[in-house]
């Protein structure tokens, strides 16, 4: 008869074997012994399924088939990093740091792993949830697939409740083996290890993810300060003591010269690593100095990513095609003989505009040098003129739009040629793709391929038509089944409730980006107010300059725009700003003004997003972790370690009912 004590002993033994092998790269037993212990564990679990926990080593082999990936909100945003491409960029970064916090600084330099950013949540030392970065605010729940990565411990060495960030990746050797198998089976090959890792973590069948031999390096906690450390380097050391895998090739540098030396070293040695890196990350080491530097909307001001110089590769320029963007700009695109650049196969590259082609004397048939700008976007650097045979053809931009045959114009102070026909099909199609994108109306399931199908089959001619699509028509599209169509229609319906700034950005008004759209929405509150605004009123608003104001006035003077807005209203699309408007609230109403608030536990009446929105509307900033800098903790039922820490630090604790008292009288956020 199986002994539960022996079962628990086996779990601890197998966890230690995995730690030795996958985390510190120091195997202590032969594979046969590991396999024997695992088989013993599996037999016990078969006899006693009631003993099995999510932390069992048996859960790493996969087997669970998922229905899909739920959305996960990051309590602390997973910000991206600003890039540096040369010593001058790094010197500017260093100067900004010193101007703010003084000269007593040090930088932790780490290898920038070319993988997929993920977040791991541990509760009382046990692995609870894993998620992708997503857009930094909302990611996808990939808990089950991350569990298959052997270097991720299911239990920490201490019972901490923390959120850890890191980079999941596929080692070069695993990538090579995977592509060899796919080639034998006649499947499409992965372009690079990063794509392979991302694809593996989005498998619905966890057995597939388990077979891909992924790995991970952890590089941060959502809030290192709550761990009682004062520096980033001490935080990384702490992660190692918890049993988490941290890259050992890090170095603390006290000067830019030391940073440059570290960069030069790894620029030379990067090819020798067992995994891909695409740069070096610098982080201000002192956590208090990090706090002083703060963050922008997108990235921390205390960290920067140095990107390695782009690889330059020669290939043949076969042709030049013209693309029409949503604002009518005509962009020439190089059609290339396929070639591998920075880990992916490139067959097309931007040529930007006619002036650049003329200036660089780029001709069809040339051998050209291409690179990836920032290792992402392919571009043509120059023609290799000494390889010309005389058969190459100079390129001349047409005088008419390649899509609608309208006359092309060059507007004052612009380099690009532009089609100004508002009914140009290419512009309408690109505008539709923009309208449904993540930063605009964010309609899940309406990707570029679906938009192109809808447009080519004349099911939509403008953005308003999206809101009148029927289930019957959608089911006629390729690869659109009952479930996909139901989900898509639900997503379209949900998007009608978006706040005004989302709609404004989605409409694609020239020069109006996401930030300006938010400023306009906050100031005017309704579309009706905005569309009658004059230039003087517009330019009085932060972020709105003369050129943008002219563009907005011109846009709303168009009768076709009025008709479009009426159609959107008829469809039930919200045309008011529904976000917080702090400047109109009194000090008494702004109960959380300038305060940091932490939500913990299960809320009964408010969703977590509603609670967060309410706190922000009252002037507060919502954080994911409790520290000495926390001003208030709002605790629901089953609140755990965060509540205990708040009590220990004597931080004021609110109940959900306390928070609900501040809901607006007209019904508030939870209706």
Swiss-Prot record:
- Top enzyme class, one word, equals ligase
- Family matches, as InterPro entries: BRCT_dom, BRCT_dom_sf, DisA/LigA_HHH, DNA_ligase, DNA_ligase_CS, DNAligase_adenylation, DNAligase_N, Hlx-hairpin-Hlx_DNA-bd_motif
Q: Which cysteines are joined by disulfide bonds?
A: none
Q: Name one GO cellular component term.
A: cytosol
Q: Where does Zn(2+) bind?
A: 401, 404, 419, 424
Q: Report the EC code(s) recorded for this entry.
A: 6.5.1.2
Protein residues bound to NAD(+)? 31-35, 80-81, 110, 133, 167, 283, 307
Which residues are the active-site ones? Answer: 112 (n6-amp-lysine intermediate)
Q: Which SMART domains match?
A: BRCT, HhH1, LIGANc
Q: What is the catalytic activity of this protein?
A: NAD(+) + (deoxyribonucleotide)n-3'-hydroxyl + 5'-phospho-(deoxyribonucleotide)m = (deoxyribonucleotide)n+m + AMP + beta-nicotinamide D-nucleotide
Any GO BP annotation: DNA repair
Give every BRCT domain span.
587-671
Any Pfam family matching the protein: DNA_ligase_ZBD
Gene3D superfamilies of this UniProt entry? 5' to 3' exonuclease, C-terminal subdomain (1.10.150.20), 6.20.10.30, BRCT domain (3.40.50.10190), DNA ligase/mRNA capping enzyme (3.30.470.30), Helix hairpin bin (1.10.287.610), Nucleic acid-binding proteins (2.40.50.140)
Q: Which GO terms describe its molecular function?
A: DNA binding; DNA ligase (NAD+) activity; metal ion binding
The record ties this protein, via NCBIfam families, to: dnlj, PRK07956.1
Q: What does this protein do?
A: DNA ligase that catalyzes the formation of phosphodiester linkages between 5'-phosphoryl and 3'-hydroxyl groups in double-stranded DNA using NAD as a coenzyme and as the energy source for the reaction. It is essential for DNA replication and repair of damaged DNA.
The entry assigns this protein to a family as follows: Belongs to the NAD-dependent DNA ligase family. LigA subfamily.
Its recorded name reads DNA ligase
From the UniProt record, report the name of the gene that encodes this protein: ligA
């Amino acid at each position: 008869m199986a002994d539960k004590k022996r079962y628990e002993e086996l779990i601890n033994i197998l966890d230690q074997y995995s730690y030795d092998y996958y985390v510190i790269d120091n195997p202590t037993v032969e594979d046969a012994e590991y396999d024997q212990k695992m088989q013993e564990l599996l037999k016990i679990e078969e006899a006693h399924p009631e003993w099995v926990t999510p932390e069992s080593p048996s859960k790493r082999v996969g087997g669970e088939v998922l229905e899909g990936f739920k959305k996960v909100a990051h309590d602390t945003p997973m910000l991206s990093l600003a890039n540096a491409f040369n010593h001058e960029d790094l010197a500017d970064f260093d100067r900004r740091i010193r101007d703010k916090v003084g000269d007593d600084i040090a930088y932790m330099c780490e290898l920038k792993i070319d993988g997929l950013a993920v977040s791991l949540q541990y509760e009382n030392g046990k692995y609870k949830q894993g998620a992708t970065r997503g857009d930094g605010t909302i990611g996808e729940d990939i808990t089950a697939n991350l569990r298959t990565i052997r270097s991720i411990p299911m239990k920490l060495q201490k019972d901490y409740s923390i959120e850890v960030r890191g980079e999941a990746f596929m080692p070069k050797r695993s990538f090579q083996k995977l592509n060899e198998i796919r080639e034998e089976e006649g499947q499409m090959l992965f372009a690079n290890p990063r794509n392979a890792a991302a694809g593996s973590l989005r498998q619905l069948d966890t057995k597939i993810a388990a077979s891909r031999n992924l790995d991970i390096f952890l590089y941060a906690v959502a809030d290192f300060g709550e761990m009682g450390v004062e520096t980033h380097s001490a935080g990384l050391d702490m992660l190692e003591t918890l049993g988490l895998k941290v890259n050992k090739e890090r170095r603390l540098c006290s000067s830019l010269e030391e940073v440059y030396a570290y960069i030069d070293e790894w620029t030379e040695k990067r090819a020798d690593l067992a995994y891909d890196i695409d740069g070096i990350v610098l982080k201000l080491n002192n956590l208090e100095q990090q706090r002083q530097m703060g963050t922008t909307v997108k990235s921390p001001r205390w960290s920067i990513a140095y990107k390695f110089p782009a690889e330059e590769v020669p290939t043949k320029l076969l042709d030049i095609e013209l693309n029409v963007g949503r604002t009518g700009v005509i962009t020439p695109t190089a059609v290339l003989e396929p070639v591998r650049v920075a880990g992916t196969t490139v067959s097309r590259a931007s040529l930007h505009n006619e002036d650049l082609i003329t200036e660089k004397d780029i001709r069809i048939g040339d051998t050209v040098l291409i690179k990836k700008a920032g290792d992402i976007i392919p571009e043509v650097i120059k023609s290799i003129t000494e390889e010309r045979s005389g058969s190459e053809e100079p390129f001349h931009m047409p005088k008419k739009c390649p899509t609608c045959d309208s006359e092309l114009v060059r507007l004052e102070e612009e380099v690009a040629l532009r089609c100004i026909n508002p009914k140009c099909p290419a512009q309408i199609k690109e505008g539709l793709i923009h309208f449904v994108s993540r930063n605009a109306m964010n309609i899940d399931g309406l990707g570029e391929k679906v938009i192109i199908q809808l447009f080519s089959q004349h099911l939509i001619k403008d953005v308003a038509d999206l809101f009148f699509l029927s289930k019957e028509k959608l089911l006629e599209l390729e690869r659109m089944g009952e479930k996909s169509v139901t989900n898509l229609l639900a997503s379209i319906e949900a998007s009608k409730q978006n706040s005004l700034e989302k709609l404004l950005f989605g409409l694609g008004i020239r020069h109006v980006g996401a930030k300006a759209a938010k400023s306009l929405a906050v100031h005017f509150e309704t579309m009706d107010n905005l569309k009658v605004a004059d230039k003087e009123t517009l330019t009085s608003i932060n972020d709105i300059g003369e050129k943008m104001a002219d563009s907005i006035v011109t846009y709303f003077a168009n009768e076709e725009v009025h008709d479009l807005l009426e159609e959107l209203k008829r469809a039930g699309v919200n045309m008011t700003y529904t976000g917080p408007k702090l400047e109109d609230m009194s000090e008494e109403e702004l109960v959380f003004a300038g305060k940091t608030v932490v939500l913990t536990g299960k809320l009964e009446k408010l969703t977590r997003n509603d609670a967060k929105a309410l706190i922000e509307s009252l002037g507060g900033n919502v954080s994911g972790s409790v520290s000495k800098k926390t001003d208030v903790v709002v605790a629901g039922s089953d609140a755990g370690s965060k509540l205990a820490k708040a009590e220990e630090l004597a931080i004021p604790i609110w109940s959900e009912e306390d928070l609900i008292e501040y809901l607006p009288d007209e019904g508030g956020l939870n209706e």
